[in-house]
Design a protein with these regions (language model features):
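N-terminal Rossmann-like FAD-binding beta1-loop-alpha1 element of flavoenzymes
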Residues: 3-30
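Glycine-rich FAD pyrophosphate-binding loop
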Residues: 22-45
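Short catalytic/ligand-binding loop motif for oxyanion handling, primarily in non-cytosolic enzymes
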Residues: 38-40, 89-91, 98-100, 155-156, ...
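Dinucleotide-binding Rossmann-like beta1-alpha1 core, especially the glycine-rich loop
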Residues: 47-134
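Active-site/ligand-binding neighborhood in enzyme catalytic cores
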Residues: 124-265, 269
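C-terminal catalytic lobe of FAD-dependent flavoproteins
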Residues: 369-429
C-alpha cells in the first residue's frame, strides 16, 4: 500500500492534517514556504510580549473529551489557561464603551434609547423574543436586512453598519449573511461535530444575560507557552520541505505540483495530496477576493494595564481605521511592567506596495501583515471557487483542507476540526 501523503502548506490546516495522518502511520511530506510551521496562528514576540495574528483563543464544544480538544490537551501537556473573555465596543458618537456583543441592559445608557426600544419590538413578542417567522433567513439574505430586522436600524447603525463595512470592504446591504456568520454558528454550541451552514435561523444578536464570545463553552483556552509548541509537535513525524508552491501543472496528462526550486511533485507518487493553500493559488492564479489585516503592536512603557476591568479587546464600531484593539497580556498572562496593544486594521489587495520595504519585511516575518486573511464569499466569488473545486475533481487523489483551501470563514478550531474529520476517512496503516 502507498502510505505517502503530500501536504501543501504548513499552517494550522496543513500541520493538523499531517498530525492526524502520521498518528495513523502515514508518511507525510509538507511543502511550506516559510521557515516555521503554524501560519498566522504561530506565536510571535514583540519586546518579549507574545502575540498572534489577532487573539487566537481556542474554543470548541464538548470539553476535554472532544477529539480535537483532546489533541490540544495532549500537545500542551494540559498546560492551559482557561479564558473568560471580557469584550467591549467603543461607539465614538456616544463617547462611550458598551459590552460586546450588544446587551439589552446597555440600551438604557444610550442617547437614542426610546427610539431603540420602539424599534426592538417590531419583530419581537412581549418577552422580547425574536419572532422567527418575521425574520429573513440567514444565508438567504443580506447582512443589513437580517440585523436591522433583529435589532432595529438605530442599533444596527451604531454597532454594525460601519464596522462590518470596514471589516469586509463590503457594505451591509451587499454583504451575504452566509459569508459572515453561517460558517461559524453551528460550532458555537455544546453539540460538537463538523461545522455546517445548514438551517441557521432565529439568531439573536441582542443579549439579555451577561454574555461574551464562547460563553457556555467549557473548553476555551490558551496554551501557557503560546501556540508554537502545538504546531511544532504536530509535525515532528513529518518531513518538511521549505519551498514555494507555484501551482499544478500538466493537469490533463501527468499532473504535478510545480515549485520554485524546480522540484516536481507528481500526484501519481502519493496516496493523497492535501492542499491547505488558497485554492486559486493552487492553480497558479489569483482570482478569489479576500480582505487582509495589518497588525500594529503598540507597546506602552510603564503602563501595566490599559483596559478597564480586565477587558481583553475593544471593538471600534465607527469609521476609525481599526476594527479591534487587544491587550494581549490579558490572554497570554505575560508578566511585564509594560503592556502591549495589538491594533487590527483591515487592508485590501495591493496594500503592501505603500509601505517601506524594511517595515513590510519585518511585518510579514512577524505575522503582522497578510493581504489574504478573510475570504469574501460573494455570489460571484462562490461561483469562482466552485469552478476550482470542479477542476480539482479531475485529479482523483487531490483533496482540500482548511479555511483557505475550502474558502471558509473559520477560526482555528474549525480548521483543525476540518483536518480531523478528513482523517477519519483513512484507516491506520
Amino acid at each position: 500500500m502507498n502510505k505517502k501523503i503530500l501536504v501543501l502548506g504548513g499552517g494550522v490546516a496543513g500541520a493538523s492534517m499531517a498530525y492526524y495522518l502520521t498518528e495513523k502511520g502515514y508518511d507525510v511530506t509538507i511543502l511550506e514556504k516559510n521557515s516555521k510551521i503554524g501560519g498566522l496562528a504561530r506565536t510571535c514576540y514583540y519586546s518579549g510580549h507574545p502575540y498572534e495574528f489577532g487573539p487566537h483563543i481556542w474554543f470548541w464544544p464538548g470539553g476535554t473529551e472532544a477529539p480535537i480538544n483532546a489533541t490540544v490537551v495532549k500537545l500542551t501537556n494540559d498546560e492551559l489557561f482557561y479564558i473568560d473573555r471580557r469584550l467591549l465596543t467603543y461607539v465614538e458618537s456616544d463617547q462611550r464603551a458598551y459590552r460586546y456583543p450588544v446587551h439589552y441592559a446597555d440600551v438604557a445608557r444610550m442617547p437614542e434609547r426610546e427610539t431603540i426600544e420602539r424599534e426592538l419590538r417590531q419583530n419581537r413578542d412581549g418577552q422580547l423574543k425574536l419572532i422567527e417567522s418575521q425574520l429573513p433567513e440567514i444565508g438567504q439574505c443580506k447582512f443589513a436586512e437580517y440585523f436591522t430586522a433583529a435589532i432595529g436600524a438605530t442599533l444596527y447603525d451604531k454597532f454594525m453598519a460601519n464596522y462590518t463595512w470596514k471589516m469586509w470592504n463590503i457594505p451591509g446591504d451587499e454583504l451575504e449573511t452566509s459569508m459572515v456568520w453561517a460558517d461559524r454558528f453551528s460550532a458555537a454550541t455544546e453539540t460538537g461535530g463538523a461545522p455546517t451552514t445548514t438551517k441557521v435561523s432565529g439568531y439573536d444578536p441582542l443579549k439579555f444575560d451577561d454574555h461574551t464570545l464562547g460563553k457556555g463553552i467549557r473548553f476555551q483556552v490558551y496554551p501557557k507557552g503560546g501556540w508554537n509548541s502545538v504546531w511544532d509537535a504536530m509535525v515532528t513525524r513529518s518531513a518538511i520541505v521549505r519551498d514555494t508552491i507555484l501551482g499544478i501543472q500538466d493537469e490533463h496528462r501527468k499532473p504535478y505540483v510545480a515549485t520554485a526550486s524546480g522540484t516536481k511533485y507528481y500526484f501519481g507518487d502519493y496516496h493523497t495530496v492535501f492542499s491547505s493553500i488558497d485554492i486559486d493559488r493552487l492553480w497558479g492564479e489569483d482570482t478569489l477576493p479576500y480582505t487582509g489585516r495589518m497588525m500594529v503592536p503598540l507597546l506602552i512603557p510603564g503602563l501595566a494595564c490599559a483596559f478597564p476591568n480586565g477587558a481583553e479587546s475593544v471593538h471600534y464600531s465607527s469609521c476609525e481605521f481599526q476594527t479591534r484593539v487587544t491587550e494581549m497580556k490579558v490572554i497570554t498572562r505575560h508578566e511585564s511592567p509594560d503592556t502591549m496593544l495589538l491594533i487590527e486594521i483591515p487592508i485590501l489587495p495591493g496594500a503592501a506596495k505603500v509601505f517601506p520595504k524594511n517595515t513590510l519585511d519585518y511585518a510579514i516575518e512577524h505575522n503582522l501583515f497578510a493581504e489574504k486573511a478573510y475570504p469574501q464569499q460573494s455570489e460571484q466569488a462562490f461561483a469562482t471557487y466552485y469552478g476550482y473545486v470542479d477542476r480539482c475533481k479531475k485529479i482523483p487523489n487531490l483533496r482540500m483542507v482548511g479555511r483557505h483551501a475550502e474558502f471558509k470563514y473559520w477560526g482555528m478550531a474549525e480548521t483543525v476540526n476540518s483536518a480531523y474529520q478528513k482523517s477519519l476517512d483513512f484507516e491506520a496503516v
